[in-house]
Design a protein with these regions (language model features):
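A nucleotide- and high-energy phosphate-metabolite-utilizing enzyme signature
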Residues: 1-173
Length: 173
């Protein structure tokens, strides 16, 4: 991120190109850290078969327009049945499994480094905001959008993109 900022300040790169580069770097971080976190989590709790984590990016990341000071607006979802149970040595129900996994993913993305947090992560755009669960099923998300979401929440969806999850689910969402 520092190198992109230097290029911008020195006028060696177009601001829109730097913004896209910040976004691409953040997406790689989301994908790599999420995959590593899932692998570690599955070692303890197994998998919930037929279910996967999906991460939506909203705001500047969703629109591929990050700046050096942007946070990551993320909504975490899971596919499959919420009542399913993981198959690990310490099994968890589907909803609990994905909420704990989501907490770890957010923690990995916001880990403290020598220069501060890797990324500031904002999850308040999830269904029901801070009053809602950190990670909800895709079906619950769709129902919330149809029945309860405010107009501004629908507007926020115009910049939303799937940045982590299976390609078929990304297309469906």
């Amino acid at each position: 991120r520092f190198a992109f900022g230097v290029q911008l300040i020195e006028g060696r790169q177009d601001p829109l190109d730097v913004s896209l580069a910040y976004s691409q770097l953040a997406e790689v971080a989301v994908r790599k850290l999420t995959a590593a976190t899932i692998a570690e989590f599955e070692a303890a709790h197994g998998k919930v078969h037929g279910s996967e984590l999906v991460i939506l990016a909203y705001g500047r990341l969703g629109g591929q327009a990050l700046t050096h000071a942007s946070d990551l607006d993320l909504v975490l979802l899971f596919t499959g049945e919420s009542g399913a149970e993981s198959d690990g040595r310490r099994p968890l129900g589907g909803t609990l499994y994905f909420n704990r996994l989501a907490q770890r993913v957010v923690g990995a993305l916001s880990v403290q480094t020598g220069t501060g947090a890797l990324y500031e992560v904002d999850t308040r755009l999830r269904p029901s905001g801070t009053q809602g669960m950190l990670c909800v099923s895709v079906d619950s998300f769709a129902k919330y959008q149809r029945e309860e979401a405010w107009a501004w929440e629908h507007m926020a969806l115009t910049r939303a993109r799937v940045v982590y999850g299976p390609a078929d689910e990304a297309e469906a969402i």
